[in-house]
Amino acid sequence: MYKLIAIDMDGTLLNDHHEVTEEVRDALHAAKAEGVKIVLCTGRPIGGVQRYLDELNLIEEGDYVIAYNGALVQNTHTNEVVSELSLGYDDLTSLYDLSLELKTPMHFFDSSNLYTPNRDISEFTVYESYVTQVPLHFRKIDEVPKDILIPKVMFIDKPENLSRVITSIPKDVREKYTMVRSAPFFYEILHSEASKGNAVRQLAQLLGIEQAEVMCIGDNGNDLTMIEWAGCGVAMANAIPEVLEAANFQTRSNNEHGVAHAIHELVLAK
């Protein structure tokens, strides 16, 4: 019996209209009623998750969320931070210099805001702010507080340009950080120990749940570590090839209530 289900949001929990369908909502409630811990595990900031936590009633005592691709693990009932891994100002300045060298826009977060140092604001930065409902600000790098804590920096660009950028990142920079492509136009840069897999593992240990009792559901590159670590890794039908290959089970797409199908097949039917 699975005791913890960690679920990615965009492309997994949510359909392409950024909605939780009734079928998915009912399956989550049924699993929770059976005592299964439901944890949203997303690249989004907390502000971009909260309305879904409220909608799904994942804000009760003992409920948790994993945000910023594993850089933050937080109790949603008390807001107590279980784990937080951040980049600092020196990381920001070096990554900004790299973005200029590679000719790619970038943006970054603090605990509650999204910032861009690019005066010509990228359409993908605007999209990120809109989808996550996080306030967007233009901020020159030399105006950023030196004590800032940054959950993640993102290089953003058209998919073909971003692919070129990714292959051009120097090896020493790659080795210094966790880097994941979370969407065709998003490349995320985090603390070296931050990943969805590490965050799910840490939370399972905190809750006394064995690896074999954990199911993880996802679709994109930032989900790969948790899909590989889980006792049962579930790939959406719309997942990238690497996730499909790593998964133990393939469910339907995010527009076909895939999360509900996986829960019915692997949890509620047992």
UniProtKB/Swiss-Prot annotation:
SUPFAM superfamilies attached to this UniProt entry: HAD-like (SSF56784)
Matching Gene3D superfamilies: 3.30.1240.10, HAD superfamily/HAD-like
Signal peptide: none
EC number: 3.1.3.-
Highest taxon listed in the record's lineage: Bacteria
UniProt keyword annotations, A-Z: Hydrolase, Magnesium, Metal-binding
Family, similarity comment: Belongs to the HAD-like hydrolase superfamily. Cof family.
NCBIfam families: Cof-subfamily (TIGR00099), HAD-SF-IIB (TIGR01484), PRK10513.1 (NF007806)
Full protein name: Putative phosphatase YxeH
